[in-house]
Amino acid sequence: MTSVNLSRAPAAIIRRRLQLQPEFHAECSWLKSSSKHAPFTLSCQIRPKQLSQIAELRVTSLDASQASEKDISLVQTPHKVEVNEKIEESIEYVQNLLMTSGDGRISVSPYDTAVIALIKDLKGRDAPQFPSCLEWIAHHQLADGSWGDEFFCIYDRILNTLACVVALKSWNLQSDIIEKGVTYIKENVHKLKGANVEHRTAGFELVVPTFMQMATDLGIQGLPYDHPLIKEIADTKQQRLKEIPKDLVYQMPTNLLYSLEGLGDLEWERLLKLQSGNGSFLTSPSSTAAVLMHTKDEKCLKYIENALKNCDGGAPHTYPVDIFSRLWAIDRLQRLGISRFFQHEIKYFLDHIESVWEETGVFSGRYTKFSDIDDTSMGVRLLKMHGYDVDPNVLKHFKQQDGKFSCYIGQSVESASPMYNLYRAAQLRFPGEEVLEEATKFAFNFLQEMLVKDRLQERWVISDHLFDEIKLGLKMPWYATLPRVEAAYYLDHYAGSGDVWIGKSFYRMPEISNDTYKELAILDFNRCQTQHQLEWIQMQEWYDRCSLSEFGISKRELLRSYFLAAATIFEPERTQERLLWAKTRILSKMITSFVNISGTTLSLDYNFNGLDEIISANEDQGLAGTLLATFHQLLDGFDIYTLHQLKHVWSQWFMKVQQGEGSGGEDAVLLANTLNICAGLNEDVLSNNEYTALSTLTNKICNRLAQIQDNKILQVVDGSIKDKELEQDMQALVKLVLQENGGAVDRNIRHTFLSVSKTFYYDAYHDDETTDLHIFKVLFRPVV
C-alpha cells in the first residue's frame, strides 16, 4: 500500500486553518480564517440553507499563500508513521479474518445449544449425545440468572432462559443454576407486555409453548405456567397452526422448516425429503436437532457435529452463514470506502457466491432448498457490480400475484432492510430488465410509506441508524452517489459490533459488524481527507497564479470541481489524477468562455496549434497569454507519447467549441479521455468500437444532464430523474461498463466513463445546499 507523504509545513498550515473539534454534535470550529477574514465557526447542526451563505468564506479559508506544489508529498511525521502502521495492522487483521471465514463466524445461540443438549445418546446410553452443550449452558448464565445477548430484549432472554432451564433439568444438573433461571423468568415475564414486537425472536410464539409443556412434564416448579401472557402466547400458536395447511410442511421448503421443534407431532420421516444437502433443515441447528431426536438420521447428526465445531461447545442459531457473511462483509467494506484494500479477498468471496448460486436465489447458507429476497438481492447487486453473469429474473421468485415482493413465501409482515436491499439491487439495471424496474417502484414506495409514518418495521436487525440510512438511500440514488460521499455518511450509520441480528435468539456477525472495519475506515478517511486538504491549498494557489477569477471562475466553482474529483477518485496516491480532473473541468470552462467572448469563427483542423492561433488573435494579449500559459502548464510534465494523445483529444474538443458545438457532453468526453490517456491508455483503443460506444453514450448522457441542470427542469420519480431516454442510456452505459465481455477496453478504463457520468448526474440531481453539505463532510469534517 502506498504511504502518504506529507510535509510539516502544510500540516502546520492545516492545523492553523482547520481548528477541528472531536465532538460531532458540539459546536466545531470548522475553519479558522486567513488574514482576510475574521475567525469563523460553523455548527455541525447547521441548517442546509445557511451553508450556501458560508460558501465564499469557506473556499477562501484554506488559502494557498503559504503553500507550494512541492508541499504536497514530502516527509513523514511521527504521527503519520503511527497512523500508517495502524492502517497496515488493521488491513492485515481484516485480510486474515476474511480469508479464514470458512462457513462464516457467528455467535452462540443459548436456545439452539439447549435444544441440542436435549438429545440423548444415539447408542442408547443414559447420557447426552452432546455434553459440551450442557457445559456451555452452565458456564454462560448471566448474573441476573438469564441467558442471552448483552443487548437486553425480553423475548431473547425469556426464550433462551426457558430452554436452558429445561435442558439442565432434563439431565438433573446444576439445580442452583436452574433455580436462578426459574426466578428470572417468574420475575420478568410481565415485561413481555408492551415489549417491542419487532424485536420478537423468530418462531417465538411456536417454541415457547412447547418448552413450557416440556417444563411441566419435567416437574419444574415456580415457572409462570398460568400467567396471562404465557396463555396468550399459547393461543397465538394454536391460531397460527390452524392457518397452516396440514400437509404444507411436507410438500416444499418453507420457513416452517426453521421451527420444526415447535410444531408438535409430525411425521418426521416424511420430512427427510426436504433435508438440505448439508443435512440441515433450513440451516437451523435446533430444528435439525428435533428431526435427529425422532429419526436418528446420520445426515442430521453430521450437520450438528459440524455446527458445534467452531462455537466453543455451543451452537449458533443458524449454520452455515457463508453466503450471508460474505455478501454483507463485501457490502460493508465497500460502503465504508475501504474495499480497495481487499480486492483479492472480495474476488475470493464472490467466486464462492457464484459457485453456490441457485436459479431460485440464495439463503444465508449454501446447500439449502430455500431462498430469501434479502440474500438474493445483495448477491445480484454485488455479482453484477463486479462483472459476474447473474440473471436478475431470479427475483421473480419473490414476486406475488398482486405484484408485491416478499422476503420469502409465507412471510406475514415485510421488513424494511430486505426491501432496501431489493431497492439497491434494482438500481443496477441493464436495458430490458423489467423485473428490476418493477422492484424499484415497489421497494421505493414500500420504504417511502414507512418513512412518512416516521417508523420502520424491521424484524431482522437492530441498528440505531437504519432509519437514517434508508432515508438517505432514497434521497441519494446510486447514479447520484459518489464513493466518498457514501463513505462519509456510512461512517455515521455503521455501528460496528453494535449491530444486533435477530434469529431464534439474538446474535452477532463479526465478519459483518466489526469495530476494526470502522477503525480502519476512519483512519483511512481522515488520511485521505488530509491529503485532499493539502491539494485544495494547491488548487487555490493555482487559482491565484493563473488569475482564474478574470475568466469568471469563482473559488466556489473551483472547490466544487475539486470536490467532484476527490469524492470520486479519493485514494491518497492518486493526487495527479484528482488535480488533472479538477483543472480539466475548470480549464475547459475557461476556454469555452474565452472563445464565446472573442466571437471568432476561425476554422480549425486537427492542428493543435489552432488554440494558440485563436488566443494570439485576441486583442487582450494579457488575458490570452494567461489562458495559453495555464493550458500549457496543464500538459507540462507528460511524456511525448502521452502529450501527443492529449493534444489530439483537446484539439478535437476545441474544434467543437469553436464551431459552436461545445456541450456538457463534449466536456465529459474530454475529461474521460484525458484521465484515461494519463492512466496509460493505448492510442489504438481510442478508435476501438467499444470505446467509441462508451464515448458516444457518455456524451449524450452528460449533455442531457447539463441541460437539466442549466434549465432547472429536474423531476424525480422513484428516486431517479424522470427522463425515460436518459434512464435507458444510463442503463446501457452501466451494462457496457460492468458486464465483462472480453473486449479490448480495460475495465478500469470503462469505469472512468461511468465515474464521469455519475458526477454529471450528481450535479443535476443535488441542489447547491446539499452539495455544500457533502463538500463539508468529504473535505473538511473530521471523522472521530
UniProtKB/Swiss-Prot annotation:
UniProt xrefs under Pfam families: Terpene_synth
Pathway in which this enzyme or protein is active: Secondary metabolite biosynthesis; terpenoid biosynthesis
Protein name: Copal-8-ol diphosphate hydratase TPSSA9, chloroplastic
UniProt short sequence motif DXDD motif, positions renumbered to this chain: 372-375
Residues holding substrate: R240, R459
Documented EC number(s): 4.2.1.133
Gene responsible for this protein: LPS
GO (cellular component) term, any one: chloroplast
Binding locations of Mg(2+): D372, D374
Function statement: Involved in the biosynthesis of labdane-type diterpenoid including sclareol, a diterpene-diol that is used as fragrance and flavoring, and has anticancer effects (able to kill leukemic and colon cancer cells by apoptosis). Sclareol can also be used as synthesis precursor of ambergris substitution fragance products such as ambrox. Terpene synthase that produces 8-hydroxycopalyl diphosphate from geranylgeranyl diphosphate (GGPP).
Organism domain of life: Eukaryota
Notes on the domains: The Asp-Xaa-Asp-Asp (DXDD) motif is important for the catalytic activity, presumably through binding to Mg(2+).
PANTHER family according to UniProt: COPAL-8-OL DIPHOSPHATE HYDRATASE, CHLOROPLASTIC, ENT-COPALYL DIPHOSPHATE SYNTHASE, CHLOROPLASTIC
GO BP terms in the entry: diterpenoid biosynthetic process; gibberellin biosynthetic process
